[in-house]
């Protein structure tokens, strides 16, 4: 039986944020009755906000699903995920601490453009293994609308393709589905919620992020400049990207 949530750990979520997540889950059929959902908790503001949103949905939605949490520990210096475990267990949820020497294996990629993507692929593989081992069939990730927009422009500028991340898709093996319930949410919303609640945010400590400005950061700055001129920017981008985001929604 899944642990129940303690009343004292129920975190209020802003209605707008909750509505946007609920709409995304409905629009893309992200969670089905009886699903066992494993949330990838990095310790950032986005995954911590998503944890609060999904625990609230689990309590109040008519949709019945199980929820667990996994944190990938890349064995990088100063990464201490214990506060995340305390937070998750305080919510009455199972927490899986996945220790893998991703940091060590990635050192030979340091300084190359592929460094971040290499780490991301490694982390994703660890999460897939955890989900399969523990009997989960859905992996929930914390990318938001800003992330989708940045990926869209990076693909267009550097690969000559109109692509972005998918809101909901099956992995190649067919046994897991991956969902991104924050697809309609803005980064500033998750930041305001996580910081306002005093959630145990872990600051990024990857040396590659400090030494080399990423292309994603450049896209973030470009979009911020354009949004300052046109506040409707992300609404328009969402409309433009929706066919791309929905292309692999499972039947």
Description of each model-found segment:
Residues 87, 153, 227-231:
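Long, contiguous binding/interaction regions
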Residues 73-75, 101-103, 171, 184, ...:
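Short, solvent-exposed coil/turn elements at secondary-structure transition points
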Residues 218, 222-244:
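An accessory alpha-helical subdomain
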Residues 66-67, 146-218, 222-225:
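Catalytic subdomain that performs nucleotidyl-dependent activation
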């Amino acid at each position: 039986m899944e642990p129940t949530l303690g009343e004292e750990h129920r975190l209020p979520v802003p209605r707008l944020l909750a509505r946007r997540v609920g709409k995304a889950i409905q629009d893309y059929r992200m969670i089905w009755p009886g699903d066992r959902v494993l949330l990838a908790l990095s310790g950032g503001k986005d995954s911590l906000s998503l944890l609060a949103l999904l625990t609230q949905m689990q309590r109040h939605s008519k949709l019945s699903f199980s929820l667990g949490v996994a944190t990938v520990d890349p064995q990088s210096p100063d990464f201490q995920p214990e506060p995340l475990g305390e937070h998750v267990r305080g919510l009455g949820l199972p927490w899986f601490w996945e220790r893998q020497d991703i940091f060590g294996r990635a050192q030979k990629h340091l300084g190359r453009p592929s460094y971040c993507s290499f780490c991301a692929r490694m982390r994703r593989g660890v999460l897939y293994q955890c989900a399969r081992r523990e009997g989960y069939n859905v992996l929930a990730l914390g990318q938001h609308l800003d992330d989708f927009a940045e990926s869209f422009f990076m693909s267009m500028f550097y690969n000559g393709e109109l692509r972005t991340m998918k809101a909901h898709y099956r992995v190649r093996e067919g046994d897991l589905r991956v969902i991104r319930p924050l697809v309609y949410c803005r980064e500033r919303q998750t930041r305001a919620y996580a910081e306002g609640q005093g959630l145990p945010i872990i600051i990024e400590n990857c040396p590659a992020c400090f030494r080399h400005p990423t292309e994603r950061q450049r896209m973030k700055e470009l979009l911020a400049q354009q949004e300052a001129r046109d506040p409707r920017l992300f609404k328009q981008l969402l409309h433009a990207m929706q066919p791309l985001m929905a292309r692999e929604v499972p039947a």
